[in-house]
Amino acid sequence: DVYKRQVWENMSFNPYERKLRTCACWGVTWLTVIFWAIPVALVSLFSNVDYMSDKIGFLGWIKKIPSVPLGIIKGVLPTTALAILNSLLPPWLRFHARMSGVPTRNLIELSLMTRFFIFMIVQNFIILTVLAGIQQNLEAFWDDVKEPKKFVQDISSAIPRASSFYLSYMALIGLSASAGIFSQIIPLLLYYVKIRFLGSTPRKLWHLRNDFNSPAWGTLYPSTLFMTVIAFGYMVLQPVTNGFACVAFFLLYLAYRYSYLYVFDCKPIKETAGQFFVKAIHFLSLIHI
């Protein structure tokens, strides 16, 4: 297990090279966070299709869509697209952590947790909230850009307007994520694919049939923390968020409790002695302050 925990190609770096690689990889991470605003902005357009169809002429056909499909476009499509975008990023951020010279796999997951949480707060909360409010009043926003006081007021007034999007997001995560954890459809399909194509020796076949999956702490904690930030941020502005948050967290609690008892195996190579929880508490305290 100690052998598997080490990232041996990162053990040969001297301290100066490791610091240089760390700075370079964090620079790439921040560039990713900044330029990821483009697809996030496109996602936010779907949540304001009524306003966009009024202001942009060639989108007028959207008004002719029946109410049920239009409700799906405004409510389900943006949150689903955001969840898909979020699922594409962790492998790329994990690669950043690995290339920065982190020597062990558990520390790579800790670094991934930090990077992914920063991304979700900056992109999925701050930028998405601002975009959702700005798109409803573009003229006033551009007029107030040169006046810092009015600009700050525009940003603060944009926060309540994005509440409906985050309500849909919490409902989607609470229902779909918990259902996916209980059903385990994707892991089941992958199990049979691995048995068919990767079980070339009796040893590999035994491991495929008897080894359990381990929880992906580096992505699980940021996703849960992001929902917590939404609940804290809108608990006064939009009190109905409290109900959605309670239902979502209760469903996720049942799903993960079942998984930890019967599905997951916390492997020693990813053991951090509780550092994920400590970092999560620090992040929540910082956001609260």
Each model region followed by its residue ranges:
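Transmembrane transport/permeation module of multi-pass membrane proteins
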Residues: 1-287
